[in-house]
Amino acid sequence: MCGGLVYPEVPLSSSTAPQAQAPHSSQDSLVAAGGWPFLITAFIGRLPAATVQLGLLLYVSGAGLGLGLAGITVAAVGLGSAVGAPLVGRLVDHFGPLPVVIAATVIQLLSLTAMLAAVVNDGPTALILACAALIGSANPQVGAIARAHWSGLARRRRQPRLITRALGYETACDETSFILGPVIAGLLVGLLGPNPALLTIMAWVIVGQGAFIMYLARHRTEHGAATVEDTAAGGIGKISIAKALPPMMVCLCVGTVFGSTQTALTAVNVLRGTEAYTGVIYGFMGAGSAVASILVSRLPERFPLSLRVAIGASIIGLTCLGLVTLPSTPVIAGLFVIIGVGVGTMLVSSFGRGERIAPSHRIASVMTMLTTCLVLGVSLGAALGGVLSVQPERGFMLTMAAAVVGILASFALHITKPGRLATHQE
């Protein structure tokens, strides 16, 4: 998690896709292609993961263990997710999403239970952090699974424009979940207290991810493991590292923007005594990103992905020139909306390139690789931003540096533009 993509890269021929269906109308909607059950459950299924991370931060600090340990706990969740995401992707490609999502949900619930027991019984810090890492590694990666499903649909239906709209929609869903998840976590801990809140979050995991599991169980034939035909259609099945690195770098830059702006914004509000506004203002970035994700998917095909990334990164860099002056709170909120537009543009473009370079039976693997880079970027941005934000404006300078690297990555995207290898032609 974490759209506007053009999908030229050579349409599937009968030799490369023996199972391809006849082309459908390019105007088919996402609802017609995916169905309401998939759209609803895939959105609900990613909300628990967005709730858990901040929920654990508030839980550990609210339980009296200190904000320092709470921050390290969240870092352990992020590290676990970064390590576990590629493995989850490979397992999904090999076994299909249903058994993987079930196993991940069970591991998450057991780890949350162990963390609750460790905190209540004054367990060692190492145990708490180990539980946090397991919780992160067992993230079922619903967003990546959803993107892989859309890619499969687009390839089977020979509908390049379907994936461009779908990736924009999926990024908007991710951003919406990033807004709603922290709100849900904050309300639960604030209204119920630490221990009841964690129990409620566990129930939320069961309901949210359980809904997606029920959908997968009822549509097993549509969401199975990679078939022999998939492997044949995907060629030798190897992911080109040279072509994968540029979109991975873009995701790393976007994650750094997320992490650095969060720490810099927190530092600004602490300095001004307006800490309560931090989450609200940060949500403006998510709103801008969600809107941009949808709009970018409507851009005409003459705008290549590399140009879109360059424009998105430039928007972020130029906006940071205003942020380093530390303007008033309303102005910062407006600037965060603009940064969100740049972020959304970069995200949908990077995931779009990732989809294009992925063999048919390795799509989930590529999507989770990009998710891993996004998570690592958030951790990098938060860590470096925390050091630099002793003077708040310096945190936004890190954001500006990430934007510059994003512009460089756009050149790499252009140089490594896929040839006649997949379903489209850029």
Predicted regions and their residues:
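Helix-loop boundary and gating motifs at the non-cytosolic
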Residues: 21-82, 234, 238-281
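Hydrophobic core of transmembrane alpha-helices in multi-pass small-molecule transporters
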Residues: 43, 125-142, 252, 332-345
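Helix-to-loop junctions at the C-terminal end of transmembrane segments
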Residues: 84-97, 189, 292-305, 389
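C-terminal ends and interior cores of transmembrane alpha-helices
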Residues: 106-122, 315-327
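Cytoplasmic helix-loop-helix junction between adjacent transmembrane helices
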Residues: 134-174
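Intracellular juxtamembrane helix-capping segments at the cytosolic ends
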Residues: 140-155, 265, 345-358
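C-terminal transmembrane helical hairpin of 12-TM major facilitator-type secondary transporters
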Residues: 307-347
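A late C-terminal transmembrane helix in Major Facilitator Superfamily
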Residues: 361-392
